Amino acid sequence: MSQSVKRTAADKPLAPCPICGKPARTETKPFCSPRCADIDLGRWLGERYVIPGPEEEEMSYPPRSDDENRSR
């Protein structure tokens, strides 16, 4: 008789790091290291990654009440 081995989520291999392609680590998931996580954060902060949306000119915002009070 063969024994069945139950696999848990911890046994499942993680996807590769999106920055360098090395195996990701649980501690820094989805990255392989804090360095790769920092590189990714820097790309977001440097606006190399963007989420598509309407241009700022196309967006309309209602006037804020504190803006109205300042013009008086």
UniProtKB/Swiss-Prot annotation:
Residue segments, region Disordered: 51-72
Coiled-coil ranges (or none): none
Pfam family of the protein (one): YacG
Signal sequence residues: none
Superkingdom of origin organism: Bacteria
CC cofactor: Zn(2+)
Co-factor remark: Binds 1 zinc ion.
Record's keyword annotation contains Nucleotide-binding: no
Alphabetic keyword roster: Metal-binding, Zinc
Binding-site residues for Zn(2+), renumbered to this chain: C17, C20, C32, C36
Keyword Metal-binding: yes
GO biological process per UniProt: regulation of DNA-templated transcription
GO molecular function: DNA topoisomerase type II (double strand cut, ATP-hydrolyzing) inhibitor activity; zinc ion binding
InterPro entries, per database record: DNA_gyrase_inhibitor_YacG, Znf_NHR/GATA
PANTHER family xref list: DNA GYRASE INHIBITOR YACG
Subunit structure: Interacts with GyrB.
Reported function: Inhibits all the catalytic activities of DNA gyrase by preventing its interaction with DNA. Acts by binding directly to the C-terminal domain of GyrB, which probably disrupts DNA binding by the gyrase.
Family as reported in the entry's similarity comment: Belongs to the DNA gyrase inhibitor YacG family.
HAMAP family listed in its UniProt record: DNA_gyrase_inhibitor_YacG
Full protein name: DNA gyrase inhibitor YacG
UniProt source species: Methylorubrum extorquens (strain PA1) (Methylobacterium extorquens)
Gene that specifies this protein: yacG
